[in-house]
């Protein structure tokens, strides 16, 4: 039987996603990253929850700036990537790819997803069918390669697309509309992408959030995951290139978009 995980999602810091997860059985609550302590406190108050954990995906300031004020107020335990422990304020416990731990009734699997940063991780809760990818995989996009190579990011994305297609995807930023504009330059004849772009435009016109997505939806519409697609390969002039090279070219084009 699928266990119920309550999720509260909101936008803060202009385009960061704040995400709270709550296990109603144990009454435990965690925030995925801590972009804005004030916004997180307001969301907790709306739901009547108290904060127990911060699950850090990577060390960038817009994901950890709330760590210390939230720790001071709630006494939270901060979990984050072993490879970035020196850069994560207030960290209490380090984890790495392949590790597992429990959050209430839920098993949490840690996936190593470097590329955006050297030690970034994602948190996968199989019983809730949800993955939190930070700035590795976005709706219709992927993170910039600040501390990694295209090969590094490619292999991280390979791990994420191996998850079940009905896995819900939550990421770190509301970049989806701009990502859709770029995606249409790479994959303009993709009918699923065109329909999705229209829906995204409608949502954003009303200042509504475009997440969560799913792994299956991203595989059908996100050009950064469609390295196998023959039409995309032909458009890029990379019909016989390795998958990794196709991804690298798409990332290069996005950097210049």
Swiss-Prot record:
InterPro entries named among the record's database cross-references: Clx_II_MBL (IPR035680), Glyoxalase_II_hydrolase (IPR050110), HAGH_C (IPR032282), Hydroxyacylglutathione_Hdrlase (IPR017782), Metallo-B-lactamas (IPR001279), RibonucZ/Hydroxyglut_hydro (IPR036866)
Enzyme class: hydrolase
Domain of life: Bacteria
Catalyzed reaction equations: an S-(2-hydroxyacyl)glutathione + H2O = a 2-hydroxy carboxylate + glutathione + H(+)
Pathway the protein acts in: Secondary metabolite metabolism; methylglyoxal degradation; (R)-lactate from methylglyoxal: step 2/2
Binding-site positions, Zn(2+) 1: 58, 60, 116, 135
A Pfam cross-reference name: HAGH_C
Protein's UniProt name: Hydroxyacylglutathione hydrolase
Organism of this sequence: Brucella abortus (strain 2308)
Upper classification of the organism: Bacteria, Pseudomonadati, Pseudomonadota, Alphaproteobacteria, Hyphomicrobiales
